[in-house]
């Protein structure tokens, strides 16, 4: 059975329009032990994208959450896989 955790937070972009985005991240630990994630980014209830999604290198769920959050924050800053 897969173990899944949902995290929600807001992130303010530091450049461009400096909007505050609502972010949802779903982190799952696969049966192999590898962590993966999917993210959804919204602004004013409008879907802006998922960013790019790759497997995580983290070994614990806490590390996976931190790694996924850092990745999506970087994607928001650089508009990678997202619309402003």
Question: What is the predicted role of each segment?
Answer:
Residues 5, 16, 33-38, 53, ...:
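Broad hydrophobic/π-residue packing in well-ordered secondary structure
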Residues 1-24, 46-48, 84:
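Negatively charged, low-complexity tracts enriched in Asp/Glu with abundant Ser/Thr
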Residues 23-52:
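A short, structured beta-strand/loop element
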Residues 45-84:
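Mixed-charge, Lys/Arg-enriched low-complexity segments
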Residues 7-9, 23-27, 37-39, 64, ...:
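Hydrophobic beta-strand residues in large extracellular and virion-surface proteins
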